[in-house]
A protein has these predicted regions:
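Membrane-embedded alpha-helical bundles that constitute the cytochrome b-like, heme-associated redox core
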Residues: 2-257
Length: 257
């Protein structure tokens, strides 16, 4: 048994190619760490938060509206992640990333993903005004669901999911190009599997609640509630449906200040 564990550990720490040596320059190592931290961990977590935690567990919705915890986590988390990714880009700026076909694809797709991340940040900045209930004025691009807001939501949501998905491919190519140790491949694969499982579970539970309802409630007369939600797999509830689905088993209801 001891010999098996020893052999398995040796196998784990060998490069993917099976070579007995694994030497990469410092800038390659730090580039990889920055990109895995950003695109492999922080940005996917930000997507999960924005999709499934607009109404947090225990929140007494619709009596308590516009819970900004998800918004702050998404904004600050994605901002930090993008800065880390840009540091990773600077580490390889002007350097030879390799001439093989996988290295070339890694470079091209990497620039596409980086550009998508910057575009996401710019689109968030240009999303338009919000409107009540916590703003000074009830009217706003979001409250009224103006054409500008509809365009922003379609662009931001679609590009966000595509960018994170493409980043998985780019990270996998980076591991191949760097001939990374096998444990890195397995660790990243397990992490992505865990993220996918949590995503599927929360989606099945109906936790992807419409942003408009999370902020303004289920009143069917409101502008955003008179149209279909933008995006796929988004749930809407009235007060009774929400209470039955999410609050029935709670012995204590938490009001979000």
């Amino acid at each position: 048994m001891g010999a098996f564990i020893h052999d398995f550990l040796v196998w784990l720490f060998l490069p993917m190619s099976g070579s007995h040596t694994h030497e990469v320059s410092g800038w390659v190592s730090w580039h990889g760490r920055a990109m895995v931290l950003s695109w492999g961990f922080l940005l996917p977590l930000g997507v999960l938060v924005a999709r499934f935690f607009k109404v947090t567990p225990g929140q007494n919705w619709p009596h308590v509206l516009d819970n900004k915890r998800w918004w702050r986590a998404h904004l600050y988390g994605q901002s930090v992640a993008l800065l880390v990714a840009l540091v990773g880009v600077l580490l390889v700026w002007g350097r030879n990333g390799g001439t093989g076909v996988w290295a070339q694809w890694h470079g091209v797709l990497g620039w596409v993903v980086t550009g998508s991340g910057v575009a996401q940040a710019l689109s968030g900045w240009a999303r338009g005004s919000k409107g009540g209930p916590t703003d000074a004025s009830l009217r706003g691009d979001h409250f009224d669901m103006t054409p500008w807001r509809k365009g922003f939501e379609r662009f931001h949501k679609c590009l966000g999911y595509l960018a994170v998905t493409a980043a998985c491919v780019v990270l996998a190519l980076g591991l191949v190009v760097a001939d990374a140790p096998r444990w890195m491949v397995l660790a990243l694969g397990v992490w992505w599997l865990a993220l996918g499982s949590v995503f599927a579970l929360l989606q099945h539970q109906g936790r992807c609640i419409d942003t408009y309802q999370a902020i303004w409630g289920p009143n069917p007369r409101l502008p955003g509630n008179r149209m279909a939600p933008i995006g796929w797999g988004i749930s809407r509830y009235d007060a009774a449906e929400f209470k039955q689905r999410f609050m029935a088993k709670n012995t204590k209801k938490e009001d979000i200040p």
